[in-house]
Amino acid sequence: MPFEQPLTAAPTSATPFRTSRPLRTGDVAPDNRLRFDGIARYLQDIASDNADAAGFGATDPVWILRRTVIDVHTPAAFPDRLHLSRWYSAYSTRWSNMRVQLTSDKGARIETEGFWINLNSDTGMPTRISDSTLELLATTTDESRLKWKAWLDQAAPAADGLPDAAFPLRSTDLDPLGHVNNAAYLHAVEEHVTARPDLLAAPHRLVIEYRAPITAGEHLALRRRDDDESSTMWFVVNGESRATARMARL
């Protein structure tokens, strides 16, 4: 199953982009665990830092996430210092898989991968990645025929089968495109995963896929289904599932 496939290893023939920073109290839960939304912010920050350092922030400035995979092998906990490595694990002419590994001074290990789509800043549609950025992507992978395949394609269950939980949006949840920010989706995930300490206690994988943006003024509801091995959440607006998240043991 796609959900269970392993992430690619770090390249041996090239050096990933690296940075480090302290684990901050604003990103941790009451038990000092680095929250999922905190991980999302670190991933966004290193993406921006990487774009600035490599120069493709000027040639390919607008990217959106279609999927994020977060594998928590050993969680990070405050206080600690995080070390982040970012490299390109596959690409095509309009999108790329970006791997980020988070380790720490105290032994944390979190492996992530994001499916990023390059957008035309005028039309908002997927567009061809510039030649210079394609050359950069090719420095850490030989996989140049990346195709999109959903990992979470299960439709949201009927509302009468599972009750919806309202999740009011705030102005601070929006990004420069007017969409709900990636980290804000994981605020909602955090609201529910604390009910599954059995999953959090073991190495676990969280996958979130975005189908359509959620914008200001829309009424977001969360629909959740649990079983012994996993927890799945649908982000529902007017009966339409805009995103799906699933957490399970690794």
Residue ranges and their predicted role:
Residues 2-66, 113-115, 119-204:
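Hot-dog-fold acyl-thioester-processing enzymes
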